[in-house]
Amino acid sequence: MYEKILVPVDGSATSLTGLQEAIALARVMGSTIRLLHVVDEISFMTSFESSMALTAEVFDTLKKAGQDVLQDAQNRVRAAGVPVEAELYESYAGRVSDLVIAKAKEWGAQLIVLGTHGRRGVGRMLLGSDAEQVLRQSPVPVLLVRGA
């Protein structure tokens, strides 16, 4: 039924709960999972009370952390015997939810699976409001998986 499942991940326990649900579905349906991690510089910058100049070194650290999140998620999917692709995307403006929807359309995803209430700040991927926006605007079905 769903050949392509898009799964945004941020490394939080809630995000991993969503990933586990996607893996279970993909195994039954023979689907491919596409992982998406957004390096969201705007959220990182606004998480500080005082203004601070972010250096290339800080952005490199954010990207490296994102690559680690994707690698861990890929390992989990591969261990379950499910085909997997991964994408790291840097966002300098706009909402993460808009990017998730755009990437779902671009890849031809037939389902989006995401955990709700992820982390804030550096590890932020999807919060309640972003998950709600994905749910409202997505052209494909969305499975929201609530964290334990």
Task: Kindly give the residue locations of the regions a language model identified.
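Short, flexible loop segments at boundaries between secondary-structure elements
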Residues: V142-A148
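Small/aliphatic-rich secondary-structure junction motif
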Residues: E3-A53, R76-E85
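Glycine-rich, Arg-bearing micro-motifs that act as flexible, cationic patches
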Residues: L111-Q133
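Structural beta-alpha unit
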Residues: N75-I112
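Short, hinge-like loop/turn segments at secondary-structure boundaries
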Residues: S51-L54, K103-K105, D130-A131
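Residue-level recognition of beta-strand->loop/alpha-helix junctions
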Residues: H37, L88-E90, R146
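A short acidic, glycine-rich active-site loop
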Residues: L54-D68
